[in-house]
């Protein structure tokens, strides 16, 4: 065992020396805690968003529906929807760059396929079909499938169970596309990204608006390949440079004020309209708010969120499980509350469903992550090797 470990160490050192002899940047082992914090906080925002979404009065398909005609809590959706997933793609682009500095392409493909593609394809038929079942129960879709054979119904439920996993499906596509881009550009573009000034970062709003107009799927509107692809590759080529984010952090107050102003305007002006479809989703004000929010969050968290404690470390470890599993207990509890406790006050319903989403996700994660094979299919987790 010692001989094996020594050989790995020797190979690592040879690779390190080889890279530096080529004049490449030395391997960066810096842990960027602020990115971990952005990720788990954003995941929590996504969960809260889905709790409110389940009872919203704007998008009525596939949800329980509103408690009354006008709901002020629906404003939360307008405040977070334009930027929350775009932010996750930006952070993902950054972390992909850091990963590739420590791993070769073969490891990258294997790791991303296992963690992203497997759960969002194989996992649908192993576990997420259960979510598809409740999605169809909530929407009343089973009434139209009474004569459909069981195997066909199972496939439909599996596809309906994609839910929040669309994010990792798209992320896998971007990750594989990045390999082709890297082969062509050979870090020439990436090196130029280090010099990006703050004023140019702000002007990238024009590109955000442009890319938000293209590569959007017509029916399932969450697949926005244009704007999410731009955020991912911008994260990789520009924001992965610590110098860029450091310069940006000096302007956090300005961007925070700009974000608050544009966010309030966007929410008030479009409140009541469907925020998840064109033209509300990709108009100029939505894109300005989206991009300035990303800049403000990166700047603020780099300045004040680059530390950790027991809670943040724990949340960072559990955020992946919370993201993958939260919608199932949320939908399940929401459905049975509608069936058996439909007269409960709105506040109580939100609390019960919200707690169920977080607690249920954590419970499912702890269970599934301990079951061999199933954890690989559903979470992309492999068995940890014990080192002696």
Give residue spans per PLM region:
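Alpha-helical transmembrane segments and their immediate juxtamembrane cytosolic regions
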Residues: 5-8, 14-388
């Amino acid at each position: 065992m010692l001989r094996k470990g020594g050989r790995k160490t020797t190979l690592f050192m040879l690779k390190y020396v080889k890279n530096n002899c080529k004049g490449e940047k030395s391997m960066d082992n810096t842990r960027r805690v602020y990115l971990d914090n952005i990720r788990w906080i954003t995941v929590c925002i996504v969960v809260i968003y889905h709790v409110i979404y389940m009872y919203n009065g704007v998008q009525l398909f596939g949800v329980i529906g509103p408690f009354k005609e006008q709901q002020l809590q629906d404003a939360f959706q307008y405040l977070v929807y334009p930027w929350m997933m775009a932010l996750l793609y930006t952070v993902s682009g950054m972390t992909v760059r850091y990963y590739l500095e420590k791993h070769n392409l073969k490891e990258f493909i294997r790791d991303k396929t296992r963690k992203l593609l497997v759960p969002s394809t194989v996992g649908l038929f192993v576990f997420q079909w259960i979510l598809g079942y409740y999605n169809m129960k909530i929407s009343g879709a089973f009434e139209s499938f009474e004569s459909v054979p069981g195997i066909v119904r199972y496939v439909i439920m599996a596809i309906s169970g994609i839910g929040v996993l669309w994010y990792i499906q798209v992320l896998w596509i971007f990750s594989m596309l990045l390999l082709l881009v890297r082969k062509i550009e050979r870090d020439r573009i990436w090196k130029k990204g280090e010099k990006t000034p703050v004023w140019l970062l702000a002007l990238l709003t024009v590109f955000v608006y442009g890319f938000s107009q293209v590569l959007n799927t017509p029916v399932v509107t969450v697949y926005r390949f244009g704007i999410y692809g731009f955020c991912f590759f911008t994260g990789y080529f520009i924001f992965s440079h610590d110098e860029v984010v450091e310069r940006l952090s000096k302007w956090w107050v300005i961007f925070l004020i700009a974000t608050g102003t544009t966010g309030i305007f966007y929410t008030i002006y479009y409140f009541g309209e469907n925020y998840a479809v064109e033209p509300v989703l990709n108009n100029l004000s939505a894109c300005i708010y989206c991009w300035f929010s990303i800049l403000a969050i990166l700047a603020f968290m780099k300045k004040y969120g680059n530390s950790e404690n027991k809670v943040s470390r724990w949340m960072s470890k559990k955020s992946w499980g919370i993201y993958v599993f939260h919608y199932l207990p949320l939908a399940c509890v929401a459905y049975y509350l509608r069936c058996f406790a439909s007269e409960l006050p709105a506040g109580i319903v939100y609390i019960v469903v919200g707690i169920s989403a977080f607690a249920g996700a954590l419970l499912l994660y702890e269970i599934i992550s301990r079951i061999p094979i199933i954890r690989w299919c559903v979470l992309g987790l492999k068995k940890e090797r014990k080192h002696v």
